[in-house]
Amino acid sequence: MVPVIIIPVLNRYDLMERAIRSIDYPVERLIIIDNGDGYDPDMLAWTAPWQHIQNWYLWRMPTNLGVAPSWNLGIKSTPHADGWILMNSYAFFEPGQLEAFYKDCESDSITLTSAMPTWSCAWVGAGVVERVGLFSECYVPAYFEDNDFEDRARRINVEVKVSQAGIIHDNSSTIRSDESLADKNQRSFQENGSLHALRWQSGVPDAGAWDLKRRRDLGWD
């Protein structure tokens, strides 16, 4: 049984529902973090394959937390899990492929999908978080938090595996669906890329810290 699946979502709730409907293997906890505060929880009654999901949580945020804080919130809320599947809201499993992906997951390793981008569906084991820490919340609101975490993990010889399980991903659906988000992402993507390069100039960085000014300057709201 998959211990936890965490799905942050900002818009395109139809694609999030597609992701949930693709769950065809037992999951102990499904955590949906609604950063757009626009999803009707009653719709889950018609969407989710409840025969496979033991418990679900829909957390509606008053503003966009961003990717790293959303993943971290899901991890910190389930500290006794053996690991976590972090899934983009616009990715989905082909039939039988959640089980195939989970078979490639271990508590002391990271498992990525062979689809691009590889972090569109990723497993992070509890042993990895114990060694590496959480995702860096310096990156606002999205992009480079996955690169940063993987780089930190590889530097301390954490195994990073690639699963051949069938996972489909509609890349950048969030920003493609809203022209204003695409415009804001141009700036935040550049700033996050510059920060990523800067953080690694002096060796292996720690997880970093959330910063109010950076959040206000680069957030998409």
Question: Which residues does each predicted region cover?
Answer:
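Aromatic-glycine-rich donor-binding/catalytic loop that engages nucleotide-sugar donors
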Residues: 124-143, 152-163
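A conserved acidic beta->alpha catalytic loop
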Residues: 22, 34-46, 91-92
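Glycine-rich, basic loop-to-helix element that forms the pyrophosphate-binding segment
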Residues: 61-78
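Short, well-formed alpha-helical segments that are part of the catalytic scaffolds
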Residues: 11-25
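C-terminal catalytic/acceptor-binding lobe
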Residues: 145-221
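Short beta-strand/loop segment that forms part of the nucleotide-sugar
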Residues: 28-38, 59-61
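Short beta-strand-to-loop acidic/aromatic patch adjacent to the donor-nucleotide binding site
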Residues: 81-92
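Conserved donor-nucleotide/metal-binding helix-loop-beta segment in metal-dependent transferases, i.e.
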Residues: 96-112
